Amino acid sequence: MTIDEKYMRRCIQLARNGICHAAPNPMVGAVIVRDGKIIGEGYHVRCGEGHAEVNAIASVKDESLLKDATIYVSLEPCSHYGKTPPCADLIIRKGIPRVVVGCVDPFSLVAGRGIQKLRDAGIEVTVGVLEKECRELIRAFVTFNLKKRPYITLKWAQSADGFLDIRREDGNAVRLSTPLSTLAVHKMRAEQKAILVGRRTALLDNPSLTVREWYGQNPLRLVIDRQLTLPTHLHLFDGSTPTLVFTEKEKAATQILTYVTLDFGQNILPQIMQVLFYEQKIQTLLVEGGSQTLQAFLEQGLWDEAFIEHARVTLHDGIPAPLLPHGQESRFFFRDGALIQHCRHAE
């Protein structure tokens, strides 16, 4: 590991602290080093507030040290005026002689302009240190801005013989997730801006789709209910957090419920993506079920990663689990006795 890589890893570590609040901005971390010592560091905490570079510079107790320092930043410093002034201008104004950048910002208003501005000011700029890891940090930001849709994560648990649940019209579902996996799901929910289920899952499982076993904000709850036949006593309609209902009916919104009319004679998933991108500005989406909903996302290529918990339980019959497309590479690990499969969409 080189010296630059060591400090860039710290940038990445810092950036992840913004996972719940930085969106729709990307997660970014910055570290300022002089004579082999960190003299300042920061990350982008919340959209509309100071960027990572601003917070790192503000943390330096003696600004005179900046004249001989290097600033490491996981993403190219911005060069345009948004909700805050350009970070590239701040770096130039503070007289920092060297900048190390993890990856170029793909956002059209930046896209290399920040780096060029720094170089035009006579600053030494190194680009591409731990580039893959730094791009990993901003994958949701990139997907949202380039594909015009949320970054989509699919999640389900299935039995050892490939079923999501027994066939039932009511009653309790078979418990497949371990307590630790349930905790991991709540962490995942806290990191998402919206969470979606189909009508059958909402009816039979009556999920809350809230964050209860982890710290964080509740995501926007989404449910597909074509005919508006879901009973109002379900947890989705309890008012604890907003819910958006996709339907073919026309219905006025309430304080806690928003109804979005779709053309169910056409493919509804692209319509949902348009609503989430253009109207709701949702950058990340977690799809929790059920089987038909998950399979529809898979078949239409509307997914970016999937987490599948393979339980030890066998059901012998029931609702078949979704099938991942062929050619997808997965990594596997054990968690609390269950086999977890993590797959990234290979396009």
Which role does the model predict for each range below?
Residues 32, 37-133, 220, 296:
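Zn2+-dependent cytidine deaminase-like catalytic core
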Residues 115, 131, 135-138, 182-189:
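Hydrophobic, well-ordered secondary-structure segments
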Residues 103, 138, 168:
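Short, flexible helix/strand-to-coil boundary loops that buttress conserved ligand/catalytic motifs
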Residues 21-22, 129-157:
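Proteins enriched for Cys/Gly/acidic motifs involved in redox and nucleic-acid/cofactor modification
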Residues 114-116, 140-143, 211-213:
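Short low-complexity, flexible loop/linker segments enriched in glycine and/or proline
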Residues 69-79, 147-158:
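N-terminal pre-triad scaffold of radical SAM enzymes
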Residues 1-26, 41, 61, 65, ...:
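Enzymes that bind and transform nitrogen-containing heteroaromatic metabolites
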